[in-house]
Amino acid sequence: MRTRRVNPQSERDYCWHLTSRNKKSLALDLNSEKGQEILRELVKDSDVFVTNMPEKTRQKLKIRAVDLLPINDRLVYGSLTGYGEDGEDSHRTAFDVLAWWARSGLMDVVRPSDNSSPGSIPIGMGDQPSGVALFASIMTALYRREKTGKGGEVYTSLMANGAWSNGSYIQAGLFNADFPDRQIEAPLHPFGGRYKTKDGRFLLLAIIDAAKEWPKFLKAMNLEYLNEDEKFSSFKNLNSNFRDLYKILEEQFAQYNLSEVIDKLKNSGVTFGFMNKSNDLSDR
């Protein structure tokens, strides 16, 4: 079944409050001579100029780095595009769902199985980290200007930042790694599973040092009797019977609300987390 996500409904523009509050703005018609004149006067005394327009539009509006840096050689020119400054797609417009999410492979990676329909992303999920990447580039260029007296050009793209977020799997592809078919099933081991609680929430385990943390987990969750079961009495046996163990853990977690599980595990020394909903975070 395919579903469509509906964004949160509010009388207040929450996206604007997150990204644009306290900003000051000035509208210029860069197709007019007066607008171009005002822009160039502003550039003379500016530290940073940022654009997200594709190359052809910049050329038309005369806002390329080659247009503005001669006016002020201390200017740091920052560019954020969909697909980069060069290449056959450099002229294309994009949003984060297209370039950061879909084109980078992230959209495919998070699918539960190869037959699952791709999912979408929250508003700005790719824009925010890409903006931080551009900010870091600009700050580095400003530091360089402190040392050299000269500005320059820095740039990044939505696709580049998406590729970095998916870097481990892209690197695997570069190594010609085998990408097995994905199936919706229990995890490969119970130490890294996602478990549903009585109140419909999800708890995640990330027990890497099993020799140290597994006994603590069993004690915290009142499962020490499993040590007496031959199927789980050693890590070798446990791994051989992990599907049976996974079912036992599913049943155990299903007896408790998430808050109860957190109380049991929070001081146990076990590495775990839980899935929040967005409106949960306003209380924390």
Predicted regions and their residues:
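Substrate-binding/catalytic subdomain of NAD(P)-dependent oxidoreductase enzymes
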Residues: 142-182
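Conserved beta-strand edge residues that scaffold enzyme active sites
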Residues: 57, 279-280
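Conserved hydrophobic ligand-interaction patch in extracellular adhesion modules
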Residues: 47-49, 272-275
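A short catalytic or substrate-binding loop motif that flags glycine-/basic-rich loops and adjacent residues
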Residues: 10, 185-188, 197-198
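Aromatic-enriched alpha-helical interface/lid elements that frame and gate functional surfaces
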Residues: 191-272, 280-283
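N-terminal helix-loop segment corresponding to the beta1-alpha1 unit
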Residues: 1-150
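A short glycine-threonine-serine/GTX helix/turn-capping micro-motif
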Residues: 118-129, 153, 182-192, 203-204, ...
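Mid-domain beta-loop-alpha active-site segment that forms a flexible
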Residues: 124-139, 158-166, 209, 213
